[in-house]
Amino acid sequence: GGEGERIPAWCRRVVQDEETKIFSAQVWQPKKPYEFKKKAFKPTKSPLLIYECHVGMGQDAEKVGTYREFTENVLPRVVKAGYNCIQVMAIQEHPYYGSFGYHVSSFFAPSSRFGTPDELKELIDTAHKNGIAVIMDIVHSHAVKNEMEGLGNLCGDPCQYFYQGG
């Protein structure tokens, strides 16, 4: 129970191997980390007009979109339409894309299928530069019980993160 290689529950970057489909923790240390251009963003005091979006599905192309594509192609349309906030869905790492991001495996890691942590930071920074607040749609009760890439049986205790029989 709980033996073997596991992804740490607090990991901040998880990637999936294209061939084996196995997820692994990864240290993200770019030579030049992203520096936010908009240092102190404050959202508007007027009511939020929220555009709910999914980075992977918010594309014209029939593929999983990226943070960069969203920043370049979708965000300008959101700004032009007059929204002052985006609510980004499915942002945490999740093994099954069809879950719409609600079977979270790594709560502290942004989904690597959309790009790098720095590309996500650039998306947020660009939104802020355009006066757009960013809300992350994070649902703490939607975790996968998977043992390979999730929190199931993490330390040999199936009840550490989940109720028995749930």
What do the predicted segments below correspond to?
Residues 39-45, 54-166:
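Substrate-binding/active-site clefts of carbohydrate-active enzymes
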Residues 1-52, 57-62, 69:
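The feature marks proteins involved in alpha-glucan
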